[in-house]
Amino acid sequence: MNSLYRTMFFVPGNDPKKIIGAEIYRPDCIIYDLEDSVSIFEKDSARILVKYALQYNRPDCRVGIRINQADSPYYEDDVSSMVPLQPDFLRLPKAETAEDIKKLDVLITEIEEKHAIEIGAVKIVASIETALGVV
C-alpha cells in the first residue's frame, strides 16, 4: 500500500457514530484521535472504543492513532493500550525535541517485544505544532 495519502480522515475516538461511519468516505487513512477531540473525562472510554473498533471492525485502509503529547498524563496509557492493536502508526502531536520521538520509539519497541509484534511494525508520525518544535 502506498505511504502517501490523499486523504487522512480524523475521527474523535470517543464518538461511536463517527468511528462506525468513517470508512464510508473511503479515505486512504483513518486516524483515531485520542488527543484534542477527546475531553479529559473521556480519555479512557475513547481508548476502549478505538480498541473495539480495531479488534472487531478494522477499516480496510491505513490506520493511525493520534495519541496525547509526550508530557501528557495520558501519553503512556495511550501508547500501551494502542500498540498491541497494531495500527500502522502513532501520530505524536506537538513533538518538540528529538527526545520526544526517541522516548516514543523506545516505548513502542518495548511493547512490540512484549506482544511478539515485529519490531518497527508500528511507525511514528511526528507533528510539529509549536515554535520549539521548529527550532
Feature locations, PLM:
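Conserved alpha/beta-domain cores
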Residues: 2-135
